[in-house]
């Protein structure tokens, strides 16, 4: 979840700078004798056909859990102050992930607190339309995903951007990687990924199954999460499905 402005206004440059390597002092080494090496092939733009190189398949039975973050009407309906413009485009890849990883699928919802406290008071002063109870229409799952969620049990609700906490940890206990999809990349997805990684979870972010407050913020958030590898891996939906299948062989 994210109000307009996204990560572009909140320190993406600082996060990138923190991950930059330090250049060593001293003169450059002498070039090696012999012909120059062949140039390395550039990265493919096509999704990988198999599991991502470097990811360990893991023991049989340690299947991933899919956590679909905040696919709610408040983020998907035109005219909403919190619309994620590409919300509709991620419904299809989320459906493929849910089919491949069922029944280990959890849908979350962002909901407002009954009485905001601390800095949240000012937040809801800026967004008063969102200060509604959890059963308000705007906080319900979007109809385009509600059918998927119906087979997965009750949603996991939280009044925080991050959905990682004791409730989610208990539901995925003993499982494999945590696969994240949903909205918004630059707020609730990012917050959940980093909190879960800090707790020692392996996190796979299905980048093409996430939508941001805008394209630039979406891309910056994915770049920031890549800095946290190997705890956090940004993958395509096809890569997630292939890597998940490899864990059960």
Predicted regions and their residues:
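Active-site-adjacent betaalpha module
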Residues: 2-8, 19, 46-65, 100, ...
């Amino acid at each position: 979840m994210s109000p307009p402005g996204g990560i572009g206004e909140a320190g993406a440059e600082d996060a990138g700078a923190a991950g930059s390597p330090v250049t060593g002092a001293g003169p450059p080494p002498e070039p090696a004798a012999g012909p120059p090496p062949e140039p390395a092939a550039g990265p493919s733009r096509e999704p990988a056909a198999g599991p991502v190189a470097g990811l360990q398949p893991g023991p049989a039975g340690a299947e991933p859990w899919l956590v679909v973050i905040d696919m709610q009407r408040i983020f998907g309906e035109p005219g909403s102050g919190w619309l994620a413009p590409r919300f509709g485009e991620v419904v299809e890849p989320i459906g493929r992930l849910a089919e491949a990883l069922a029944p280990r699928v959890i849908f979350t919802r962002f909901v407002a607190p009954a009485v905001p406290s601390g800095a949240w008071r000012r937040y809801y002063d800026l967004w008063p339309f969102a200060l509604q109870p959890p059963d308000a229409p705007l906080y319900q799952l979007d109809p385009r995903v509600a059918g998927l969620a119906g087979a997965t049990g009750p949603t996991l609700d939280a009044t925080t951007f991050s959905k990682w906490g004791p409730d989610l940890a208990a539901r995925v206990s003993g499982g494999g990687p945590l696969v994240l999809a949903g909205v918004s990349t630059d707020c609730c997805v990012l917050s959940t990924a980093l909190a879960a990684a800090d707790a020692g979870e392996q996190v796979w972010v299905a980048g093409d199954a996430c939508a941001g407050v805008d394209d630039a913020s979406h891309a910056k958030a994915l770049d920031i999460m890549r800095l946290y590898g190997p705890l956090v891996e940004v993958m395509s939906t096809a890569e997630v499905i292939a890597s998940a299948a490899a864990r059960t062989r």
